[in-house]
């Protein structure tokens, strides 16, 4: 397994629309393992393939407290089941150190394939509903900051640049 580099906002590759996966082969299964390891390493709860510069419809997620229940969503489709929206505080591995509130439908239906290519569907509410919608946005080239005002988007971009500079300095210092 390998930890993959995660693209950071405002990288234009994050705006790429993901293509459906035609077959769940050994390469896809390896990517799933690598994405799960990457998500855990980055202390995230969800990761879309777009974020690791693979523009295919693949999401991994683990909402458990112990990081012991990874889930896989291949070629997912999400349908809101209610018009009611609720604000949720969101963050993103591609927009490090930025958190803000986004209104999302509170109940959705998920249709997808699992890691073995088997179709499933489920009704999601709460954190699962929020997380799957957030990750689906990535597959469509949308980031949670797109829902924010222009001012907040500018602040987010500046904060990410500062975060990445600080992280780069720390990495260089650790090598010395």
UniProtKB/Swiss-Prot annotation:
Enzyme class, first EC level, given as a word: hydrolase
Cofactor note: Binds 1 Fe(2+) ion.
Substrates-to-products reaction catalysed: N-terminal N-formyl-L-methionyl-[peptide] + H2O = N-terminal L-methionyl-[peptide] + formate
Keyword list, A-Z: Hydrolase, Iron, Metal-binding, Protein biosynthesis
Active site per UniProt: 135
Gene3D superfamilies (UniProt xref): Peptide deformylase
Cysteine pairings via disulfide bonds: none
Residues binding Fe cation, per UniProt: 92, 134, 138
GO biological process: co-translational protein modification; translation
One Gene Ontology molecular-function label: metal ion binding
Pfam families found in the cross-reference section: Pep_deformylase
Keyword Metal-binding: yes
EC number: 3.5.1.88
Stored InterPro entries: Peptide_deformylase, Peptide_deformylase_sf
Family, similarity comment: Belongs to the polypeptide deformylase family.
Function according to Swiss-Prot or TrEMBL: Removes the formyl group from the N-terminal Met of newly synthesized proteins. Requires at least a dipeptide for an efficient rate of reaction. N-terminal L-methionine is a prerequisite for activity but the enzyme has broad specificity at other positions.
Protein name according to UniProt: Peptide deformylase
Highest classification ranks of the organism: Bacteria, Pseudomonadati, Pseudomonadota, Gammaproteobacteria, Moraxellales
